[in-house]
């Protein structure tokens, strides 16, 4: 049983860790963007679509693969046109490999269709990796990956999209300012009010801080169980 002293120490460590968390840290990002308005704002900037309206957003969404093993997505959101968005943040390049993007994309396809459904009913999907480093390595702020017909260069049109957003580029564009915000530890330094308010809530508000401490405690317990 954890002693009071031990609990105090762990709690102090959590508070210290919370101060250093950024939107590039998945356990923090999950909480911020499970808020529908924040998820909508994020997608509007990344996809340059001000008309995009999010119906629902879930943080840490568990999705089963065909073997029944559970895979946890950072954020899963659905818009009013039933387009499905998976948003992942990755600090290590290892977790953001191209096969991982393909895997997430196929998982979503397998999970949103019911057996016997028409294939035509497959939702349009976006798998979006926001990476701390320029994983694809060509210096672009954003990379759009779509299947194309090699002979004609035309889009294949299967409505499956993969995007990589490079958080290294923090210029004065809307996306660059968003990436700046993803790299901040304090709400004060952030450009976008909607994100700053939510970050401030989890870092400075008593209730928000308690929520985040609970998240960190749950993660510790889960790690201990899996060890």
List PLM regions with ranges.
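Zn2+-dependent peptidoglycan hydrolase active-site motif and core
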Residues: 64-72, 76-205
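Acidic-basic catalytic patches of nuclease active cores, encompassing PD-(D/E)XK
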Residues: 22-56
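Short secondary-structure capping/turn segments at boundaries of alpha-helices and beta-strands
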Residues: 28-29, 42, 60-64, 72-75
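Short, charged alpha-helical interaction segments and adjacent helix-coil junctions
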Residues: 2-19, 23, 27, 46, ...
């Amino acid at each position: 049983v954890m002693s009071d002293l031990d609990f105090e120490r762990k709690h102090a460590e959590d508070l210290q860790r919370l101060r250093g968390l950024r939107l590039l840290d998945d356990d923090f990002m999950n909480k911020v963007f499970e808020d529908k308005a924040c998820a909508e704002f994020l997608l509007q900037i990344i996809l340059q679509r001000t008309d995009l309206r999010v119906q629902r957003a879930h943080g840490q969404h568990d999705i089963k693969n065909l073997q029944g093993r559970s895979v946890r997505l950072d954020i899963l959101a659905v818009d009013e046109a039933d387009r499905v968005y998976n948003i992942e943040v990755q600090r290590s390049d290892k977790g953001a490999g191209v096969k991982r993007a393909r895997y997430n994309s196929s998982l979503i396809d397998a999970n949103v269709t019911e057996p016997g459904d028409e294939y035509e009913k497959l939702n349009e999907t976006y798998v979006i990796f926001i990476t701390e480093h320029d994983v694809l390595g060509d210096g672009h702020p954003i990379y759009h990956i779509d299947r194309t017909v090699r002979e004609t260069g035309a889009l294949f049109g299967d409505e499956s999209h993969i995007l990589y957003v490079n958080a290294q580029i923090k210029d004065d564009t809307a996306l660059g300012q968003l990436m700046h915000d993803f790299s901040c530890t304090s709400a004060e330094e952030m450009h976008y009010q909607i994100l700053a308010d939510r970050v401030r809530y989890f870092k400075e508000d008593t209730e928000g801080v308690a929520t985040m401490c609970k998240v960190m405690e749950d993660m510790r317990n889960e790690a201990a169980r899996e060890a």
